[in-house]
């Protein structure tokens, strides 16, 4: 994207957000979910909540592209400002679209980096055909241990190998769905499954820079548009999970130069840890925004009213001063800018006259 274009989008986003109410700003930074394939229900959900994004899970995916395209159309009330419609389409173990024929990280880690570029070029195009504009698909974690739960999903077993394949994957998706790097600052160093606990490591900042940080720096340099923060703690840097850590957000912005949208991993995972301090999903969302996330993702334990409860909580936090209004404005502006870029690039919905021919 040319600098002049980026400046124009930023200016327009700032104007749009300046005209928003606090509630509209709060809604714009929430990515929600309801488990249905009913287009009318999905359309109503997006219209009533006004949220800025939706994540498609298995319960949202029908058996063919044409039906999925109808769903993503229903999720887009205003094509001029399309929501971020995301999916976890890594390939292999984590793949929502069953008709994805492209190799997963388990195979790609043993192939030249060019294979990762080809796979993610195909995958990104496949998603865009169906109206999915964000892929939570590039696992930038370094996983040398085959017994690690993230091993099969990581693109490399060494920092250099991972960095090469992450770079290739981002370049591959450049004309397809937007790229997301996950799980910053790196799941490989923190043992354990963050779906059920808060993995932790005592790795120092210097050690991280020379190892697990390398693939993220490479992916950012390659142009990844989103960065997903994991619910894992590097205790030598910050005792809090990275998703709630202002310091890790500072590192991403100031040291790695990331200028895109930061988003949490599913906040329901914090609840699933069983720790008392994370049992309130609304408080988790507010804390995540305060730490520097531009968008909060809510899937696990979510119901049809979860998004609005989170929005209400964000509004209340701004009104009480617990969440600075400027932080919410900044987050809403960054998300809105990305949505405007999607609309201008035509990456919200592309022609797909033969969708019916591709089925799972």
Task: Give residue spans per PLM region.
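Hydrophobic faces of well-ordered beta-strands that scaffold small-molecule active sites
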Residues: 27-34, 52-56, 83-89, 134-138, ...
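Active-site cleft segment of glycoside hydrolase catalytic domains centered on the general acid/base Glu
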Residues: 113-114, 148-162, 166
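Second-shell residues forming the walls of enzyme active-site clefts
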Residues: 21, 62-74, 161-323
């Amino acid at each position: 994207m040319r600098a002049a274009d980026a400046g124009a989008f930023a200016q327009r986003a700032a104007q749009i957000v300046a005209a928003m109410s606090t509630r509209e700003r709060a809604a714009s930074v929430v990515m929600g979910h309801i488990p249905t394939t009913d287009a009318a229900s999905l359309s109503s959900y997006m219209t009533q909540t006004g949220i800025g994004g939706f994540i498609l899970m298995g319960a949202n995916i029908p058996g063919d592209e044409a039906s999925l395209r109808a769903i993503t159309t229903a999720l887009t009330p205003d094509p001029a400002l399309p929501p971020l419609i995301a999916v976890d389409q890594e390939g292999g173990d984590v793949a929502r679209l069953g008709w994805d024929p492209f190799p997963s990280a388990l195979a790609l880690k043993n192939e030249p980096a060019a294979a990762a570029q080809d796979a993610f070029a195909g995958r990104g195009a496949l998603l865009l055909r169906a109206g999915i504009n964000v892929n939570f698909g590039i696992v930038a974690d370094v996983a040398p241990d085959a017994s690690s739960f993230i091993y099969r999903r990581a693109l490399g077993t060494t920092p250099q190998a991972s960095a090469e394949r992450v770079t290739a994957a981002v370049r591959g998706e450049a004309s397809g769905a937007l790229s997301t790097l996950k799980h910053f600052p790196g799941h490989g160093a923190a043992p354990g499954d963050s779906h059920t606990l808060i993995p932790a490591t005592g790795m120092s900042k210097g050690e991280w820079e020379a190892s697990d940080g390398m693939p993220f720096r490479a992916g950012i340099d390659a142009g990844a548009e989103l960065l997903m923060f994991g619910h894992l703690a590097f205790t030598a840097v910050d005792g809090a999970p990275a998703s709630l850590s202002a310091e890790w957000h500072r590192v991403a912005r100031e040291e790695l130069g990331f200028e895109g949208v930061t988003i949490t991993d599913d906040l329901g995972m914090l609840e699933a840890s069983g720790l008392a301090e994370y049992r309130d999903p609304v408080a988790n969302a507010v804390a995540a925004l305060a730490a520097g996330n531009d968008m909060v993702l809510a899937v696990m334990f979510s119901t049809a009213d979860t998004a609005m409860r989170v929005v209400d909580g964000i509004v209340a936090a701004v009104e009480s001063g617990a969440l600075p209004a400027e932080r919410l404005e900044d987050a809403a502006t960054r998300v809105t800018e990305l949505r405007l870029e999607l609309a201008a690039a035509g990456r919200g919905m592309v022609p797909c006259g033969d969708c019916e021919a591709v089925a799972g």
